[in-house]
Amino acid sequence: MVVSGVDEDDVDAADTESLVCTLAVRKARAVADRSGPAVVVGCDSMFEFDGIPHGKPSSTEQARQWLTAMRGRAGTLYTGHCVIDGVSGRQADGVACTTVRFGVTTDAELDAYLATGEAMAVAGAFTLDGRSAPFIDGVEGDPSTVIGLSLPLFRTLLARIDVAVTDLWVGDDR
């Protein structure tokens, strides 16, 4: 994994979908420009709740406010992807979204979760593959989108640049 160095606050977009796609393209382009003949994947995620996009929280208190408001409710996780073939220069991008339904957490559960620091590193202050997973009642759509790499979208974008997902397999894992 290579950190792109893209300033995520330097993007003005009309909506959450456009925002994550623009950021994914900028991240992929920044890495591809210095990566040579590799397939580069840029990603960005935002959680839209009550019509407002939420990236990573800026403070534990902000994370607490968000997670408290989400109790027993749902929102949409958007993840933008951009793939670039470093050999051909071909590029494809797109966005996947999944609805996330939250359970009703107790204050003690939120306190314990926030004490781990995990909330500060993820869009919307939660993740499906970490300590907050038990607080999620379900998802409508692709779970891998919530984790940050929508595998169906990734495969589709690779096909658009004439790269088979199987070409990226390394070794024989059988």
Mark where each language-model region is.
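A short beta-strand-loop structural module common to alpha/beta enzyme folds
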Residues: 1-9
